[in-house]
Amino acid sequence: PKSKGFNIFNRWQYTNTDKGVVGFLGFRFMKDEKDSGEDVDNMKVKRLPWLSEINTNRFDSNFKLGYVNPKIPYQSVGFQMAYSNHKQESFFGLRNYNIKQNSFYSNFIYNSIIGNTMNKFKAGLNYSYDDFEEFIDADKTIYNRVDKSIGSFFEYSYDSLEKLSLVAGLRYDFHNNLGSFFTPRFHIRYQPL
């Protein structure tokens, strides 16, 4: 196999501890070309060689912003977003496979306590979007699909710092293709001394 690629990544960070703010912004671009197959020069029997090629271009970006209350350090808010664009053109022998995908994700989360730091909770919202366009040579079909999902969650955690810890939560999601659904969560851990 032979390959050549190019990657560039850049990330910036902002921190202000007096105000409790931290932020990140990042970008990445990748170009990758791969060739593989049989070496026709060393073949004893002349025939069509099996070859493959994968050419990929990808762009990613992300953003994160967080705030921790300087006067109440157990209380925080966070927000993040991510976007990616992926394009791939390829063939494997006589079969072609091409895909384009655009993805977006965002998340908002709030953390705090109930009474004391042994009783913590987090609540939040998230949204995701995926747009796929696939071409599969086997049946000469283009498959297009869009997935969109929005969700919310609440999670409570208790930690006695000695023997017992537990996490209980509930999540609600609505998906454009799968409908709406609830997902409960419960974990308990007991550690005798």
Predicted regions and their residues:
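Transmembrane beta-strands of outer-membrane beta-barrel proteins
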Residues: 21-25, 75-81, 106, 119-125, ...
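Transmembrane beta-strands of outer-membrane beta-barrel pores
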Residues: 16, 27-33, 69, 83-87, ...
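Outer-membrane beta-barrel channels and translocator barrels
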Residues: 15-19, 70-72, 113-117, 161-163, ...
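Gram-negative and organellar
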Residues: 43, 57, 85-88, 100-104, ...
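Structural signature of Gram-negative outer-membrane beta-barrels, strongest in the C-terminal barrel
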Residues: 118, 126, 135-136, 140-193
